[in-house]
Regions:
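A short amphipathic helical element positioned immediately N-terminal to and/or at the very start
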Residues: 47-55
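The alpha-helix within a helix-turn-helix
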Residues: 166
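Membrane-water interface segments at the C-terminal ends of transmembrane alpha-helices
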Residues: 8-43, 56-156, 182-184, 188-204, ...
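Extracytoplasmic catalytic/substrate-binding loops of multi-pass membrane glycan-assembly enzymes
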Residues: 43-48, 213-216
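Short, Lys/Arg-rich, polar N-terminal cytosolic tail immediately upstream
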Residues: 1-9
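Glycine/proline-centered hinge or cleavage motifs at structural transition points of membrane proteins
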Residues: 169-170, 183
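Membrane-helix/interface signature in polytopic inner-membrane proteins
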Residues: 152-162, 173
Length: 216
């Protein structure tokens, strides 16, 4: 019994158990409940009335479409800014790279509402009006670390022999990037897209604070 327990503790997979339990309780189960409530009425009977009510209100549809648009723009900006940052981090010296990664991740330790209020104060200090531009800026500021880290992690683990092979075959830096680096880093890019797009499309607090109802 003791040997089995020691083997269990020494197994790497066992350390993922708390994360799996946490995800199941606070992520999977709430999502399942949302799906259940979407297709049931107050009595628990299956219905599509909830979707009918949604499509009967143009304001709700416009808000939904607008949220998708803001999420797409934010995600694209995060890719354009996050990929070069991740590339610079992955090609920096090890100690400097770790320090810079910590600096990028450090703001994530602060509550998102506090970060957003700080952004509002910054715009107010420079007398910049709140609105759509402020909203996108706040979204990018809050979620760009979620784009940088997965891309950086993928670039760090990338097999550089493919890059060397492309260079030996006469490929220029642009060709090396698009033919070797970008395809190999796509798993990190896709992870970053999911980690930015999903919270951006559903974040209400940032939109409320950075627009002050200036966008209808």
């Amino acid at each position: 019994m003791n040997k089995k327990f020691i083997v269990f503790l020494s197994s790497r997979k066992s350390w993922t158990l708390p994360y799996i339990i946490f995800s199941a309780i606070f992520v999977v189960i709430p999502l399942l409940l949302i799906v259940v409530y979407a297709f049931t009425d107050d009595n628990g009977h299956l219905t599509l009335a909830n979707f009918q009510k949604f499509f009967e209100h143009p304001e709700a549809i416009n808000t939904f479409v607008y949220s998708i648009g803001i999420a797409i723009i934010t995600t694209l900006i995060c890719i354009l800014l996050g990929y070069p940052a991740a590339w610079i981090l992955s090609n920096s010296k090890l100690n400097r790279s770790k320090t810079m990664v910590v600096l990028f991740i450090l703001p994530m330790w602060v509550n998102i509402l506090v970060r957003t209020l700080a952004t509002v104060a910054l715009f107010d200090f420079f007398s910049v009006p709140l609105g759509e531009g402020a909203l996108i800026f706040g979204m990018v500021y809050n979620f760009i670390p979620f784009m940088i880290y997965p891309i950086y992690n993928t670039l760090q683990k990338m097999d550089h022999s493919y890059i060397e092979a492309a260079q030996d075959l006469g490929a220029n830096p642009v060709q090396v990037f698009f033919k070797a680096v970008l395809p190999l880093s796509m798993p990190g890019v896709m992870s970053g897209i999911m980690m930015v797009f999903m919270p951006t499309i559903s974040t209400f607090a940032i939109a409320e604070l950075l627009t002050m109802n200036n966008i209808k």
